[in-house]
Structure formats: structure tokens, C-alpha cells
Curated annotation (Swiss-Prot):
Cofactor note: Binds 1 Fe(2+) ion per subunit.
SMART domains (UniProt xref): P4Hc
Binding site for Fe cation: 98, 100, 161
UniProt KW DNA-binding keyword: no
EC class of the enzyme, as a word: oxidoreductase
GO biological process, one term: DNA damage response
Record organism: Bradyrhizobium sp. (strain ORS 278)
Taxonomy, superkingdom: Bacteria
Name listed for the protein in its UniProt record: PKHD-type hydroxylase BRADO4652
Cofactor(s), by name: Fe(2+); L-ascorbate
NCBIfam families (UniProt xref): PRK05467.1-2, PRK05467.1-3, PRK05467.1-4
Recorded GO MF terms: 2-oxoglutarate-dependent dioxygenase activity; iron ion binding; L-ascorbic acid binding
Entry's EC annotation: 1.14.11.-
Residue sites binding 2-oxoglutarate per the record: 171
Length: 229
């Protein structure tokens, strides 16, 4: 399940993020990579323990917890503190094909999560850089993702993925992982489809529509059956 989530941040918020990030110090992105990923990773990151990363990361989480599409698709239990990276053409930055670590731990908070879902939140407009596509592989093939600034993509952490070399400009983004209440990706996808259908019925016929009410009951009973909290 690959889901695009528009307007997580407004254009003004993106501009403010970029001002803070441009004024911050950056470090080698391999510092947060696993052993396999570090061999194919070339980019820069904001230090995870730095003031900029912590401030902006909390603002990303706040925005997501107000986003109905994200909450419906992810059904999040824990969100890992967002990280921030930059791929520049001057260094030929890229991130080769890899899969994310199954478990992530944050040494600053002690948080440990199972990585069910990965998210990239784009912070540079696509016409300001060439290359830098996020390529995600699944059973249906490869999917290239390059979204407007402020938009995000959510995808299974079990997916092989890569970032193609940046050949002009700079690709700037936030990336992070989350543990869902619903461990099984197939079940999570079906529940998301059900929730989307309920929302559509409610918009068309109102919250008191008998079919919408019945399906809402089914939705909550499925969550009750499958949720790990």
C-alpha cells in the first residue's frame, strides 16, 4: 500500500522549515544508517539530537496527528522522531537500493518501535532539482515518487526502495518510521479501504445513514480484533 498524503505542511510552513534547516549544521547521513544501508547511502542529515531536528520533528508529528488521511492509513501506535536529510548535486548524493531496519531505537528518548510504515515528507519543490526520485518496489513493480513540497508518501517499511542520484539542485525531505496498531499490512489496507468507504457514505448521506452506521460498527470491531496497543 503506497499512499500519497497532500498538504501535510502548508507552503508557509515549508518555507519556515527551510529557513531553520538552512541555518543549521549538517552531518554525514550514514550516522543513522544500518550496516547494509550505510554502504549505499550518500547524503547529509540534520543531527538527530540537534535543536533544529527536534523542533521541526515535533511540528511534523503535530501536523500528522491532525491529518485524517494519515491517521486512517497508518493507524499509528508510535511515531519515530522525524529525521531530515539533504541530497545535493555537487556531491552526487543518492541512496542505493535497501530495506529499512525492522526495529528502530531512539537513544535520546529510549523509544523502540517495530517499523511497519515509512514516510517521506518532501520539503523541496520538484522543479528545483533533477533526479532524487524515491523509487519503491512492490509486487506490482517499481514506483517513482517525487511530490510537491509539503506533501508526503507512506509505504510499507518492508519495501525495497532507493533515492536516485540528484543531478541538479538539492532534494530536501523529512523521513521517519512508525509502528501501526495493525501489524498485518494486508489487514491494514482493507481497514483503510473500509474507512474511506465510510467517509464517502457519510459525506453523501450524512452521519445518520444506516449503512454508514453499520459499517462504522464493523470498522471498530475489526480494529478491536486486530489492534495491538
Amino acid at each position: 500500500m503506497l499512499i500519497c498524503i497532500p498538504d501535510v505542511l502548508s507552503k508557509d510552513e515549508v518555507a519556515e522549515f527551510r529557513r531553520i534547516m538552512d541555518a543549521a549544521e549538517w552531518e554525514d547521513g550514514r550516522s543513522t544508517a544500518g550496516a547494509q544501508s550505510a554502504m549505499v547511502k550518500r547524503n547529509e542529515q540534520l543531527p538527530p539530537d540537534g535543536e533544529a531536528a527536534r523542533l521541526l520533528g515535533q511540528r511534523v508529528i503535530t501536523a500528522l496527528t491532525k491529518n485524517p488521511r494519515f491517521l486512517s492509513a497508518a493507524i499509528p501506535l508510535q511515531i519515530f522522531p522525524p529525521l531530515f536529510n539533504r541530497y545535493t548535486s555537487s556531491r552526487g548524493d543518492h541512496f542505493g537500493i535497501h530495506v529499512d531496519n525492522a526495529v528502530r531505537g531512539d537513544p535520546l528518548t529510549g523509544l523502540r518501535i517495530r517499523t511497519d510504515l515509512s514516510m517521506t515528507l518532501f520539503l523541496a519543490e520538484p522543479d528545483t532539482y533533477d533526479g532524487g526520485e524515491l523509487v519503491i518496489e512492490d509486487t506490482y513493480g517499481s514506483h517513482e515518487v517525487k511530490l510537491p513540497a509539503g506533501h508526503a508518501v507512506l509505504y510499507p517499511s518492508s519495501s525495497l526502495h532507493m533515492v536516485t542520484p540528484v543531478t541538479r539542485g538539492a532534494r530536501v525531505a523529512s523521513f521517519f518510521w512508525m509502528q501501526s496498531m495493525i501489524r498485518d499490512a494486508h489487514v491494514r489496507s482493507m481497514i483503510f479501504d473500509l474507512d474511506t468507504t465510510i467517509q464517502s457514505l457519510t459525506e453523501r448521506f450524512g452521519r445518520d445513514d444506516p449503512d454508514a452506521v453499520k459499517l462504522t460498527g464493523i470498522y471498530h470491531n475489526l480494529i478491536r480484533q486486530w489492534a495491538e496497543v
